[in-house]
């Protein structure tokens, strides 16, 4: 990379203290941008908890900014996060669905509140360490911005970014989209970043590494109820429907019930298959390929299309969960805020509250919330 690059515009980089955002800041500095690193604090509660790493992450981000030689700032979006993301998270779980707060956080915080803050700082662009790409194509109506999958398909994060719009993509840079994670780690080591080997963050940001049920218990009342088979046999008691997601295998509390057995005499695994909120019943089935776990079609609501309008009916690929291989499907209808997908092969554990994201090859078209 050039050591004396031509000066480009001002870009504010969301720096989390992790290796991806750190290398992002360094790459943009090398490319000639005036870089400002910005650490976002999105959660206030439990800062003293053994599970919370916010303080260390802030120190890591500040240290990297100093080493790279960029301005560094701190902003607290905790109030916005609770209002726009966490409140919706609780509403969805209360309704028996399994939301994906990372999708909402990207749309409402990282590419809205953060973007607005960056523009107030005089930035022309924002950048993050997400693995995705932006491409601008000319159309008769003017330039259109497309969200593309990352070059490294094992790290592609376009699924979490599918609710971004044209205005947001026009201001966004994803420097890591053309790199593989191994290259990012190599760069971090070569330039002497102290966090080069730092473990990638996992799980929901405000929960951290703490047990999920323990966290949710603080905010939602638990209402135990029966666990039934499709035939109506009671095989256990659940702790509250909010604590279970479709396809869940561990933590059901029915391990002592044999039921259906394999040829070798061992019992087939149990899976959470359906929730009956009206009766407070959790239904479980045995066997990974039980019909109750398979869906040939789905309906989605709260649709968001990157182009600003729904794609035409036809054949596409779709993901109903992160890191899933695109499933061949047909978009049968897309009008208003709803759409329907029909799959060539039935999909496993399609979960209400999760996102169904549509792709045309490497181009992410948008998506909606599964109902």
UniProtKB/Swiss-Prot annotation:
ATP binds at residues 14-21, 40, 129. Disulfide bonds join 105-205. The record marks 130, 354 as: Interaction with tRNA. Belongs to the MnmA/TRMU family. GO terms for cellular component: cytoplasm. Gene3D superfamilies: Adenine nucleotide alpha hydrolases-like domains, HUPs, Translation factors. InterPro entries: MnmA-like, MnmA-like_C, MnmA-like_central, MnmA-like_central_sf, Rossmann-like_a/b/a_fold. This is tRNA-specific 2-thiouridylase MnmA. Signal peptide: none annotated. The active site is at residues 105, 205. Residues 100-102 are annotated as: Interaction with target base in tRNA. Pfam families: tRNA_Me_trans, tRNA_Me_trans_C, tRNA_Me_trans_M. Its main location: cytoplasm. It is found in: Cytoplasm. Keywords: ATP-binding, Cytoplasm, Disulfide bond, Nucleotide-binding, RNA-binding, Transferase, tRNA processing, tRNA-binding. Residues 155-157, 321-322 are annotated as: Interaction with tRNA. Its EC number is 2.8.1.13. Catalyzes the 2-thiolation of uridine at the wobble position (U34) of tRNA, leading to the formation of s(2)U34. It is an enzyme of class 2 (transferase). It catalyses: S-sulfanyl-L-cysteinyl-[protein] + uridine(34) in tRNA + AH2 + ATP = 2-thiouridine(34) in tRNA + L-cysteinyl-[protein] + A + AMP + diphosphate + H(+). GO terms for biological process: tRNA wobble position uridine thiolation. GO terms for molecular function: ATP binding; tRNA binding; tRNA-uridine 2-sulfurtransferase activity.
């Amino acid at each position: 990379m050039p050591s004396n690059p031509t000066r480009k515009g001002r870009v504010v980089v969301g720096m989390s203290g992790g290796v991806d955002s750190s290398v992002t800041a360094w790459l943009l500095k090398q490319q000639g941008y005036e870089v400002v690193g910005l650490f976002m604090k999105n959660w206030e509660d439990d800062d003293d908890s053994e599970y919370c790493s916010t303080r260390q992450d802030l120190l890591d981000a500040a240290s990297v900014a100093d080493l790279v030689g960029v301005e560094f700032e701190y902003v607290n979006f905790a109030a916005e996060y609770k209002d726009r993301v966490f409140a919706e998270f609780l509403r969805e779980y209360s309704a028996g669905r399994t939301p994906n707060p990372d999708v909402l956080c990207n749309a409402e915080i990282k590419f809205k509140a953060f973007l607005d803050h960056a523009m107030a700082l005089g930035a022309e662009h924002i950048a993050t360490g997400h693995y995705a790409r932006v491409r601008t194509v000319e159309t008769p109506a003017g330039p259109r911005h497309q969200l593309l999958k990352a070059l490294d398909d094992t790290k592609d994060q376009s699924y979490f970014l599918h609710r971004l719009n044209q205005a947001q993509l026009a201001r966004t840079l994803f420097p890591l989209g053309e790199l593989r994670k191994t290259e990012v780690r190599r760069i971090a080591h070569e330039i002497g970043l102290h966090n080069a080997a730092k473990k990638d963050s996992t799980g929901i940001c405000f929960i951290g590494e703490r047990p999920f049920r323990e966290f949710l218990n603080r905010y939602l009342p638990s209402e135990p109820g029966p666990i039934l088979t499709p035939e109506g046999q009671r095989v256990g008691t659940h702790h509250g429907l909010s604590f279970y997601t479709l396809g869940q295998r561990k933590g059901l509390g029915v391990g002592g019930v044999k039921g259906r057995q394999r040829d070798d005499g061992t019992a087939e695994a149990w899976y959470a298959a359906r929730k009956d909120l009206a009766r407070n019943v959790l239904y479980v089935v045995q066997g990974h390929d039980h019909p109750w776990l398979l869906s040939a079609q789905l309906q989605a609501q709260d649709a968001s299309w990157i182009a600003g309008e729904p794609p035409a009916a036809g054949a596409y690929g779709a993901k109903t969960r992160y890191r899933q291989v695109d499933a061949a499907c047909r978009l049968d209808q897309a009008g208003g805020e709803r759409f329907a997908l029909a799959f060539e092969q039935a999909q496993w554990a399609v979960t209400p509250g999760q996102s169904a994201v549509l792709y045309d090859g490497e181009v992410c078209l948008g998506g909606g919330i599964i109902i």
